[in-house]
Design a protein with these regions (language model features):
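Active-site nucleotide-sugar/metal-binding loop of Leloir-type enzymes
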Residues: 1-9
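Catalytic beta-strand/loop signature of glycosyltransferases that borders the donor
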Residues: 107, 161-167
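Short beta-strand-to-loop acidic/aromatic patch adjacent to the donor-nucleotide binding site
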Residues: 9-18
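Conserved core of the sugar-phosphate nucleotidyltransferase
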Residues: 21-112
């Protein structure tokens, strides 16, 4: 829908999540100053959040747990499920329900990506295959951006720079999360991070 309208790098986020100011600034600066739109591989960047800053007090969460090399380049992003705090640390499972080990300080993707305009061609090219592979009656499968990007990383067709941020992510994963989000936004306003009326003069 946006192909032909977007002529420069752009940011992709989940509309119902709060990511923090530093994460936005880092991705903006990368796209303006560093991103190579003419690279032989897709040059992307990603907000890398600390896992412990993205958990819910009200239940388990799913996160894209990242492996990053010493140069800050993404090696893999693995969807990891049922991440929750327990008495002896974090518990989690893979897609098949097998237990996996995760660390509170691991970087995770919260679906915050800096993307060059040319990447839209890749998304368009892959969509028919996604539709062809759907089973009859399947209305739940999603054309997931993290999986597309991870596939391109593994095939050496994309390079993703992970921009670490200490910002605390928050969103409403469970209805019980709502008050905590309201309180967190209020605290940011009271601290002067944001204005009471965001778009006022």
């Amino acid at each position: 829908m946006v192909k032909g309208l977007v002529d420069g790098p752009f940011l992709v986020i989940n509309a119902d999540d709060y990511y923090g100011r530093e994460a936005f600034k880092k991705i903006h600066d990368y796209m303006v100053n560093t991103m190579d739109a003419d690279s032989d591989v897709y040059d992307l960047c990603m907000g890398g959040f600390v896992l412990s800053n993205t958990l819910s007090d009200n239940g388990a969460v799913t996160r894209g747990v990242c492996q990053v090399d010493d140069d800050g380049i993404l090696k893999t992003v693995n969807e990891t499920y049922n991440i929750r705090m327990a008495e002896n640390g974090l518990l989690a499972t893979d897609e098949q329900g097998n237990p996996v080990t995760v660390s509170p300080d691991q970087p995770v993707s919260m679906n915050m990506w800096g993307i060059p305009a040319g990447f839209l061609d890749e998304l368009e090219a892959g969509f028919p295959e996604f539709l062809d592979n759907l089973k009859q009656g399947d209305i739940k499968s999603e054309y997931l951006l993290p999986r597309i990007i991870d596939s391109l990383v593994q095939s050496k067709r994309a390079r993703v720079t992970v921009l670490g941020t200490p910002d605390k992510w928050f969103g409403v994963t469970y209805k019980e999360d709502k008050q905590a989000v309201v309180d967190a936004v209020r605290a940011l306003i009271d601290a002067g991070v944001y204005k009471e009326k965001l778009y006022s003069e």
